[in-house]
C-alpha cells in the first residue's frame, strides 16, 4: 500500500500539530521542510496556506493555530473568545514578548516590569523570556519609579535606556504619553504600540500643548508593523522603525 504524498498544506498542518497546535509565522518558516517545494518563495506559500486553509485559524497577527486544536490552544494561552479581559491580557503579553525578542536580536538588554513576569507569551512566562524584571539603576529614584512601569524597555551596553515601549490595547494612551514626558531627558526612542484603528486617537492626544516637548519623538507602531519586523528577524537591520 503506497503512502499518500503530503502536499504543502499537509506539511504545514503537521508542523503545527508537532509544535503543540500553534506556531508563529516565523517559526513555521524555520521548521517546515521546503526541500520538496517547487517554489523560490516558500515563505509566501506558507503565508497563503495559513491565511486560506480552513484547517488553520489566526490567533493574533503572526500567530496561527490548528482549528482541530482550537480549544486546547486557547486554554493554554488562557484566552477566552469574546472575553475582553482575557483578550487584553493575552494581547499585552504577546506583544511584550515579541518586542523582547526583537530587542535581544538587536543586542539590547530587555526589561519588563516585575508585575508582568507571570504574563504568558506563547506558553512561557515573560519573566523567563526577558533579560530582567529588575530595572537597572540608571537615574534618580523618582525617575526609576516612573520608568519601571513601562511595558518594555531596551537598554544599551552601558545599561542606559535606548527605547521605551507602551502597548495600548484598550487603555488610555494619554497615560503612556505622560510617562514618556517624564522620561524625555533620556536619549531614547518612545513608542506606542497599538491597533491601527487607534492611530487617530494617538495623534489627537499627542498634539496638545502639554506634550509639545516630545511630540516629534514619539512614534506609533501598529501591531502589524511589529509582527512584520519580528517575522523578518534575520533582516532586522533592514527593518528599523
Question: PLM features: residue spans?
Answer:
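Pre-recognition alpha-helix immediately N-terminal to the DNA-recognition helix
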Residues: 10-14, 98
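Active-site metal-binding core of divalent-cation-utilizing nuclease and nuclease-like domains
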Residues: 83-88, 104, 112-159, 231-241
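A short acidic, leucine-rich amphipathic alpha-helix
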Residues: 27-32
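Short capping segments at the starts of secondary-structure elements
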Residues: 16-24
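Charged low-complexity interaction tracts in eukaryotic proteins
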Residues: 1-9, 19, 35-82
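Catalytic cores of nucleic-acid endonucleases
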Residues: 130, 136-150, 156-222
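Nuclease catalytic cores
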Residues: 75-113
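Charged, structured surface patches that assemble and position nucleic-acid processing machinery
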Residues: 210-241
